[in-house]
């Protein structure tokens, strides 16, 4: 199997952990795997280097100088792991962004301009130079794997077509790992981090959450859009269909095939429409956000009548329910009798019915990072 291992900063934050990673890599190599390894800076190294640059320059460092200093964190990890692997008689070859002659990953900003220093770690649009990167990976990295060696590659950084250093922004090391897998046609990218995989709940908030062994890219992007962070969703945009992403706890890295969560599928936009016309029921009231159980009671009453809600919207002054058009009038009469009868304390004062509503569903991972996208979509519909 051709595999990419991506080690997060916690996973290699000490010399002992680097040694353990090297031993695991050497063992995988003996089993016949072709391996490339992507490494983050150790622990809090990036922030320490940023603070040093800010202090030394009174926050007036030019961007390339800052990148060179910060990149030393990833390069240190790269050379430490390379040394550890060589001590185990592994043919390890380092690839660091400061050495342009061997570096394979080429990424530009859309306008070709350098970004502001204070935004070194922000989310940014990227233009991955697919053809050039694939050519360089084929010429520089693949030969190492084919002869039985290990390519050790710095994460988070890239070079532009004009040769400048740049970063991949938030989630950059995850992006690096997936891109390396993409350009090496790897069967799996294994992200080795400080959690055991993707869980059914946050273990800090819920007892005994269970490990989810498999999930789709779409599901993971949905989780990430609502605050969950295991694999950065930006990284998943570059995942090929043929490549599996696996999230594994560094404490269980010796059992890669038996642990963690596998992420399957690809990240792609979708457009669909509900085939059946909908009705929109709008219930108006006061201080609805401060009242407990309003939406639950409405849904319960409709459910007992065999009427399904397909979507809902609420705020402090109204509850808007969407349901099949054929159920609209029955639901209207039911909810009107509810708000004027036994449930007047819910604070609802008026209900309106609008039939003939169409439902169009658009989904894209780009929506989260695209300001004004809702206005653009609704302007087309208007």
Regions flagged by a language model, labelled:
Residues 255-382:
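A conserved regulatory-domain signal marking ACT and ACT-like small-molecule sensing domains
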Residues 188-192, 245-247, 310:
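Short hydrophobic alpha-helical runs that function as membrane-insertion/retention elements
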């Amino acid at each position: 199997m051709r595999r990419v291992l991506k080690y997060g900063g916690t996973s290699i934050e000490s010399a002992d952990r680097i040694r353990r990673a090297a031993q695991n890599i050497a063992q995988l190599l003996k089993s016949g795997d072709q391996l490339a390894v992507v490494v983050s800076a150790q622990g809090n190294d990036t922030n320490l280097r940023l603070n040093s640059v800010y202090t030394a320059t009174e926050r007036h460092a030019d961007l390339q100088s800052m990148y060179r200093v910060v990149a030393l964190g990833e390069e240190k990890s790269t050379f430490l792991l390379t040394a550890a692997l060589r001590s185990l008689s592994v043919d390890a070859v380092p690839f660091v962004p400061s050495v342009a002659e061997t570096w394979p990953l080429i990424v530009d900003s859309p306008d070709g301009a350098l970004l502001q220093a204070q935004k070194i770690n922000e989310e940014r649009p990227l233009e991955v130079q697919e053809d050039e990167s694939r050519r360089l990976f084929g010429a520089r990295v693949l030969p190492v794997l084919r002869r039985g060696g290990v390519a050790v590659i710095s994460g988070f950084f890239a070079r532009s077509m004009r040769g400048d250093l740049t970063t991949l922004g938030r989630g950059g090391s995850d992006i690096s790992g997936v891109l390396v897998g993409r350009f090496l046609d790897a069967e799996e990218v294994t992200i080795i981090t400080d959690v055991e995989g993707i869980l059914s709940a946050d273990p800090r908030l819920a007892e005994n959450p269970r490990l989810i062994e498999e999930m789709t890219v779409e599901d993971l992007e949905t989780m990430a859009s609502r605050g969950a962070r295991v694999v950065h969703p930006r990284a998943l945009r570059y995942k090929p269909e043929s490549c599996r992403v696996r999230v594994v706890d560094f404490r269980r890295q010796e059992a890669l095939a038996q642990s963690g969560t596998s992420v399957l599928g690809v990240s792609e936009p979708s457009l669909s429409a509900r085939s059946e016309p909908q009705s929109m029921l709008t219930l108006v009231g006061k201080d609805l956000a401060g009242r407990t159980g309003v939406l639950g009671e409405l849904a319960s009453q409709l459910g007992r009548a065999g009427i399904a809600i397909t979507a809902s919207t609420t705020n402090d002054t109204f509850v808007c329910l969407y349901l099949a058009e054929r159920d609209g009038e029955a639901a209207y009469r039911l909810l009107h009798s509810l708000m004027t009868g036994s449930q007047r304390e819910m604070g609802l004062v008026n209900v309106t019915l609008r039939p003939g509503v169409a439902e169009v569903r658009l989904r894209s991972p780009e929506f989260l990072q695209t300001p004004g996208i809702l206005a653009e979509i609704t302007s087309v519909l208007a």
